[in-house]
């Protein structure tokens, strides 16, 4: 079976790696981001890809920066048939990409050339797209700009979040990769250059983008909430404190209240957004609290507000 160096970090990558292992590919090395200390107790956290690699006794490399590292020198000696990446999180040196005997291949979570960059799945939800997908593409020096070998589309459901799409697309990407790699061997692989006129970028989500603005309609706010679930979460400033909203629902009803006003907190919690649109909150997280459904919130702090009160700060 063909030899592979695999590079990836989150669960999206581990699903793809597991697929290569299950299919019998000879995984010579796994490269992932360094372990991180997380939480107040600074517990060491290994990436999902590292955990999968260790489970199968595969050699793991974790350079803080691959370019110029000792690890790169070792990896260059392997000269695998394929270099495969799936959500690795670093630029790869061109000389390393060229060390693959057959091809350096990336599993990308969008229908390229739409959403080049580090957050393609989040932007597909944020922009209210009805469809996303995966692309198997050649890795080149320029970010996500290589020729396309194969693509497969996936509908985005109204209740999809970035989290649910990560799970769906990791499976779709795994399966499409495993369909595509044999085509290199039998000579049937096709390559399609990307249309540069249709390129859309999806840079990593900034801290500023995490806040729900009162200039947003209920639908736009809901798209942001879904896009930032499960991480890092979208928030409003409620009573001067950060208030995360994990799940919400735009309503058909309209209100005359200005944006940021409580419409009702009787049995449900509805706030006004731009254009008189209404957003019903379903799962929330006040500062210093755990996530809770809206019923629990209304039984406590949420009962203290009154309809018509401006509760969301700019």
Curated annotation (Swiss-Prot):
Q: What is its EC number?
A: 2.1.2.9
One cellular component (GO) term of this entry:
cytosol
| UniProt xrefs under CDD domains | FMT_core_Met-tRNA-FMT_N, Met_tRNA_FMT_C
A molecular function (GO) held by this record is: methionyl-tRNA formyltransferase activity
- Cross-referenced InterPro entries: Fmt, Formyl_trans_C, Formyl_transf_N, Formyl_transf_N_sf, Formyl_transferase-like_C_sf, Met-tRNA-FMT_C, Met-tRNA-FMT_N
**Keywords, in A-Z order:** Protein biosynthesis, Transferase
For the ligand ((6S)-5,6,7,8-tetrahydrofolate), the binding residues are 110-113
**Broad enzyme group:** transferase
User: For this protein, what reaction is catalysed?
Assistant: L-methionyl-tRNA(fMet) + (6R)-10-formyltetrahydrofolate = N-formyl-L-methionyl-tRNA(fMet) + (6S)-5,6,7,8-tetrahydrofolate + H(+)
The record's annotation in NCBIfam families points to: fmt
Role: Attaches a formyl group to the free amino group of methionyl-tRNA(fMet). The formyl group appears to play a dual role in the initiator identity of N-formylmethionyl-tRNA by promoting its recognition by IF2 and preventing the misappropriation of this tRNA by the elongation apparatus.
**Family according to the record:** Belongs to the Fmt family.
What this protein is called in its record is: Methionyl-tRNA formyltransferase
């Amino acid at each position: 079976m063909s030899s592979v160096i695999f590079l990836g970090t989150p669960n999206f990558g581990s699903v793809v790696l597991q697929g290569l292992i299950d299919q019998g590919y000879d995984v010579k090395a796994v490269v992932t981001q360094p372990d991180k200390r997380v939480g107040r107790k600074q517990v060491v956290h290994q990436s999902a890809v590292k955990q999968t690699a260790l489970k199968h006794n595969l050699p793991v490399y974790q350079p803080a920066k691959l370019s110029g590292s000792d690890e790169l020198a070792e990896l260059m000696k392997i000269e695998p048939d394929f270099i495969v990446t799936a959500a690795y999180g670093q630029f790869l040196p061109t000389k390393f990409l060229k060390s693959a005997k057959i091809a350096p291949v990336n599993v990308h979570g969008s229908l390229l050339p739409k959403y080049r960059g580090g957050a393609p799945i989040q932007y597909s939800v944020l922009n209210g797209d009805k469809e996303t997908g995966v692309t198997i593409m050649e890795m080149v020096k320029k970010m996500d700009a290589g020729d396309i070998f194969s693509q497969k589309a996936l509908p985005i459901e109204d209740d999809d979040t970035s989290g649910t799409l990560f799970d769906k697309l990791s499976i779709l990407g795994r399966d499409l990769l495993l369909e595509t790699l044999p085509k290199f061997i039998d000579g049937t692989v096709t390559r399609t250059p990307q249309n540069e006129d249709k390129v859309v970028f999806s840079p990593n989500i900034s801290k500023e983008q995490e806040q729900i603005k009162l200039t947003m309609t209920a639908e736009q706010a809901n798209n942001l909430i879904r896009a930032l679930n499960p991480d890092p979460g979208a928030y409003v400033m409620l009573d001067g404190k950060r208030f995360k909203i994990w799940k919400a629902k735009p309503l058909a009803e309209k209100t005359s209240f200005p944006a940021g006003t409580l419409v009702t907190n009787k049995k449900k919690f509805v706030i006004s957004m731009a254009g008189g649109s209404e957003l019903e909150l379903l799962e929330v997280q006040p500062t210093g609290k755990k996530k809770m459904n809206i019923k629990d919130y209304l039984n406590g702090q949420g009962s203290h507000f009154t309809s018509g009160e401006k509760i969301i700060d700019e």
